[in-house]
Amino acid sequence: MITVKLYGLLRIDSGIKERKIEATHMKDVLDDLMAQGISRKDLSGCVILINGKSASKRSVLHNGDVVQLMSPVAGG
């Protein structure tokens, strides 16, 4: 089981703070979040951490991993 935590606009827009899912690759996580209504565009620009370390959309996951997804910060 993987714990997925959302932060920033991803959390605000989706209303999802945390989900527990079965996944072996980041693609599985992203597919699950799109099924929950988060757009591919919003997910494409997000920062991905696995167990607190920078990761990519091609990363492999292991039971007990914590995936954190954050929307990029913008200002102006």
Which residues make up each language-model segment?
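Ubiquitin-like/PB1-type beta-grasp interaction modules and other compact soluble beta-rich domains
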Residues: 1-75
